[in-house]
UniProtKB/Swiss-Prot annotation:
It is found in: Cytoplasm. It comes from Helicobacter pylori (strain HPAG1). ATPase subunit of a proteasome-like degradation complex; this subunit has chaperone activity. The binding of ATP and its subsequent hydrolysis by HslU are essential for unfolding of protein substrates subsequently hydrolyzed by HslV. HslU recognizes the N-terminal part of its protein substrates and unfolds these before they are guided to HslV for hydrolysis. Gene3D superfamilies: 1.10.8.60, P-loop containing nucleotide triphosphate hydrolases. This is ATP-dependent protease ATPase subunit HslU. One of its GO terms (molecular function) is proteasome-activating activity.
Length: 443
């Protein structure tokens, strides 16, 4: 069931579990996502008139721009795609054209809908798989047998199915027929070429062609699950629903938008295709029709969230028409030493919890003293100040450095609980951070 009806307060509360600070950014994005729900409650004629208010997020790398958008799209089960503006080229140049981001969104949307339909049919699919395997393991019943024999066979089949479900026969081998693996199609090529590719595949690689394979029961379960899913699912309905959902509630996150801004300071040294990419992007953000392999999609109701650091350029360096299409602007705060500490201690799946869980797999307990966590936050913050500011990502590199030896020699610590102290953190990191020339080694 979709969680599109979450209130802005609920959205912000959810984000607070994973992202520290950035209240204004969370608030703006929460309202934008809530408006998606509000629009869908209106009459059809009015829905068409209301377009989303696109957002421009301004902030350094690692402060939570992508994470905010990604987390909301995930919890609300919306079609979402993250792209980097710098990867696109102007029409006529070699590279990806901007329309491919819409095609990627539609692909993700169809996959999202397909997974939902599979979940609904999960029990039915598993029953069909188990029944098919059981009939392979049991010799077939000869014709003309008595009702008593038929009942005995039915009982044996039921017992066999129970054993398969419990995994008792996972290592047994059986021969089954499976479809030939389909050829992957590149979704980044224009729709016209996609159709040619699909037609060629139908000619040279018929879907109904099957091959016999000897697999273990465990492997056969997975192979048959995919095949039976395709049989039970209404692929046409899934495609149509995926297309509709991408059109009405899709979200495209465009990172590094500042990389295609033409700075007035740089002048003639700028890449001439940057402005071309902006002009190609403009009709998609304004609202146009893009052809995909699933059909045409209108883009005027897709929510676009652009983000960039804008260190070498300003938002005003974007072409005026594109600026006007991102009416909501949010500036994200740089991370302080205190926020670094809170990221390590207060987030639901903090980096510390992640490393503790990873090493627990090896039977090694890890405990961090509070002073050690504060020192990690302090040294990570100092490293950001002295070198390139990569925000919270710096914490990954510093913790990795501190735990490097323990991770490598995990078997030596089996059954032990290792305490990470302030002194240990300092011994691993302070020499590197103190020397500005060596700070690059912990990037």
């Amino acid at each position: 069931m979709s969680k599109l009806n979450m209130t802005p307060r609920e959205i912000v509360a959810y984000l607070d579990e994973y992202i520290i600070g950035q209240k204004e950014a969370k608030k703006s994005i929460a309202i934008a996502f809530r408006n998606r729900y509000r629009r869908l409650q209106l009459e059809k004629s009015l829905q068409e008139e209301i377009t989303p208010k696109n957002i421009l997020m301004i902030g350094s790398t690692g402060v939570g721009k992508t994470e905010i958008a990604r987390r909301i799209a995930k919890i609300m089960e919306l079609p979402f795609v993250k792209v980097e503006a710098s990867k696109y080229t102007e029409v006529g140049f070699v590279g990806r054209d901007v329309e491919s981001m819409v095609r990627d969104l539609v692909n993700n949307s169809v996959l999202l809908v397909e997974n939902e339909h599979k979940e609904k049919l999960k029990d039915k699919i598993e029953e069909a798989v188990v029944e098919k395997i059981a009939k392979k393991l049991l010799p077939p019943l000869p014709n003309g047998v008595s009702e008593e024999k038929k009942q005995e066979y039915a009982n044996s089949l039921l017992k066999m199915q129970q054993r398969i479900v419990q995994g008792e026969l996972d290592s047994r081998e059986i021969e089954i027929e499976v479809r030939k693996k389909s050829i992957e199609i590149d979704s980044n090529v224009p729709p016209e070429i996609l159709r040619v590719q699909e037609n060629l595949i139908k000619v040279f690689h018929k879907e109904q062609d099957k091959v016999k394979k000897t697999l273990s029961v465990k492997e056969a379960k997975e192979a048959l699950k995919a095949e039976i899913s395709d049989t039970l699912l209404d692929s046409e309905a899934i495609k149509m629903e995926g297309l509709k959902r991408a059109e009405s509630s899709g979200v495209i996150f465009i990172d590094e938008i500042d990389k295609i801004a033409v700075s007035s300071k740089e002048g003639s040294r700028q890449d001439p295709s940057k402005e071309g990419v902006q002009r190609d992007l403009l009709p998609i953000v304004e609202g146009s029709v893009v052809n995909t392999k699933y059909g045409s999609i209108k883009t005027e109701h897709i929510l676009f969230i652009a983000a960039g650091a804008f260190h070498l350029s300003k938002p005003s360096d974007l072409i005026p028409e594109l600026q006007g299409r991102f009416p909501l602007r949010v500036e994200l705060e740089n991370l302080t030493e205190e926020i670094m500490y809170m990221i390590l201690t207060q987030t639901k799946t903090s980096i510390i919890k992640q490393y503790q869980a990873l090493l627990q797999v090896e039977g090694v307990g890890i405990a961090f003293e509070d002073d050690a966590i504060k020192e990690l936050a302090k040294l990570s913050y100092n490293a950001n100040q002295k070198s390139e500011d990569i925000g919270a990502r710096r914490l990954h590199t510093t913790i990795e450095k501190v735990l490097e030896d323990i991770s490598f020699e995990a078997e030596d610590y089996l059954g032990q609980k290792v305490t990470i102290t302030k002194e240990l953190v300092q011994s691993k990191l302070e020499d590197l951070v103190a020397d500005e020339n060596l700070v690059k080694y912990i990037l």
